[in-house]
Amino acid sequence: MVYRPSDARTSSPLASVKTAYGRCGEESTFTVAALRAVGIPARQVYTPRWAHTDDNHAWVEAWADGHWYFFGACEPEPVLNLGWFHSPASRGMLMHPKVFGRYNGPEEIMLETPNYTEINVIDNYAPTAKAIVTVTDAEGKPVADAKVEFKIYNYAEFYTVATKYTDAEGKASLTAGKGDMLVWASRNGQFGYAKISFGKDDALQLALNRKEGEAYSLPMDLVPPVEGANIPEVTPEQRAENDRRMAQEDSIRNAYVATMMTEKQAKEWIDKLYGNTLQPEKKEKLVNFLVASRGNHQTLKDFLSPIRKEKDAVSWEEIRAIWILESLSAKDLRDVTLDVLNDHLLTNISDWEKIETDLFKRMYLNPPRIANEMLTPYKKVLREAIEKTVYQSVPDSMKRDPKVLIEWCRKEIKINNELNSQQIPISPMGVWKARVADEKSRDIFFVAAYRSMGWASAAWIDEVTGKVQILNEEFAKEDVNFDTAEAAQSRKGVLQATYTPIRSVEDPKYYSHFTLSKFKNGTFQLLNYDEGETDMGDGTTWRNLLKYGRELDEGYYMMVTGTRLASGAVLSNSTFFTIEPGKTTTVDLVMRESKDQVQVIGNFNSEATYRPVDSTEQRSILRTCGRGYFVVAVLGVGQEPTNHALRDIAALGNDFEQWGRKMVFLFPSEEQYKKFNADEFKGLPSIITYGIDVDDSIRKEIVQAMNLNNSILPVFIIADTFNRVVFVSQGYTIGLGEQLMKVVHGL
């Protein structure tokens, strides 16, 4: 399998095989399973968050000759203890694998559960230091059993990477890479926090002197560890042999991928099944589903074929089948099973005839997915079981009252969060049989049970807050409270944020530039305003979310903003405020700037492809440039702004040669390239690769991501393979070469 981003749910190893690609967590899960299957001890190593860039990563360690050796899962290098992440790992602050059962080795224990022990292996990858945190009350007395969270700034939030509890002397410790973290301590509703610099601060005293309701802002500068990778040597012979083996492995994978349905094959199959009875747009959707299902396409075909019974018409059952497929995520299409699809299709909605419009029929369809659980069949069996038990002795007038089901869950399901140590959701039928569950699995069970009853109503888990909600008879959302066995509308206010644009950020993005979190049990919990289908980083924007106001539950909140510099350092600002019912709260969204350091100003997908002028096949920017920084340009041949830019770069050709990183110069078309004469610009560095921007895709991506004019060339960016853009220029610019080199020197 090869790398491709996807959503946060991790595919099983066999599902990843059927897909032939996956994100790093799936690649490493697959590789660990494969090694263990042939008797080689292996474990997944995970850094919850990098400190120097907005991302995380997972890879593999394997045991050989008495030692653990790391490698890049499905991206193996010629030798062990080498991977593309080698340099980033040297800037890591925390890395941990899970060890089965109890563990008494030399590594620091991060978490101990009845099933596994989580250990800290950061010492194997980066220089480290230990720091001791002492938590006191407002009077300076040590506080025992205080919760201490060590947080890294990442994706515009302070993310908890380690949680400890203080001893009788109020102390807790952590060993980490030599960079900055935020330490957050809490107990009995009071909290306190401060920055700690590992390697500089060996001790920190932290008072619980903050409380809910205080309004203020706090700027903070955070510096990640410096890079210090010790890269093992790879001989040319080793590299050549590795390339040969990779090519062979690619051929095996590609032979399997060739068995998946192409768009043409899918279209032919759909046309044969439905003829002219199905609307073209619905046909197109089904074609897309079959192609997107990868190695799971036979499951979809087996789902659609048996319900095709009328040659001259499309039944409601078939329409519902299409709606079910539409409700699935891209990953669900790749691993959903036939029994799941049939269970959700064949379990009828009792009130189906009462629902007047297609819109509401789709609303009450109640799709298979609830949260990030493994999809299982449950509707038919669960509905029959609930009717015979929960509602058997209930008066007819109350058989559709959600309070009956809420009260049953409160009384009959025992909550034990410790038993589910890995927090993998228990299936709805598993909860029904055991009557014991963690809170998250209980929530999923309630939604599953509610949906199974076939009522003209809806239940779900809110994606932003994680609350269980239902739709009442007046089509209003109500929060389910299992403590009181009630469902009621929450009290809300409005948050509005003002923003004065800085040079590099016109419309701040959620997760890239800011986040919101709500106070609960002494700490703040992130609100998830997600967009897209990747595991992290795709969010909405200030303009769409907060410029005109956003309704939020009453309570105490924190807004975190951050400007990521090219060095990896962050200029953050945290604003604390309260949302009151029926009122509008206005805060400033502050993006801090640095006058001295290079800043991250946008994103560019380094996996984007182009066609080199000397090739007939497309190639990614990443493959051309390797890991690190690079320059990408889209040129306007013969245009004065482009000529100026090329001459400025040629004038500093030696400087760019010394820098040594790749530059990819693209032309809008083959015809444009044929008009280009490099001899007109003597001195252009040899590190330039020329190519064709196929379908104008790279230019469009840069223009959209950087909010540029759609028609002006040239466009230049400096970016890196963490997809960070640190420089952009468009159109006529004098001294472009000097500007580029100024940024290069600041990296």
Predicted regions and their residues:
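Short, acidic Ser/Thr/Gly-rich low-complexity loop/linker segments typical of extracellular
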Residues: 154-176, 522-546
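Structured interaction patches on ligand/partner-binding surfaces of diverse proteins
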Residues: 189-211, 564-592
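Hydrophobic/aromatic-rich core segments of domains that either
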Residues: 4-15, 19-111, 183, 407, ...
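Secondary-structure boundary elements
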Residues: 1-19, 240, 249-434
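Short active-site neighborhood of thiol/selenol oxidoreductases, capturing the structured segment around
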Residues: 621-649, 662-666
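Short, ordered, surface-exposed loop/turn motifs in non-cytosolic proteins
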Residues: 138-157, 178-180, 401, 502-532
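Short, internal strand/loop/helix patches
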Residues: 679-713
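A short, amphipathic beta-strand motif
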Residues: 129-140, 170, 493-506, 600
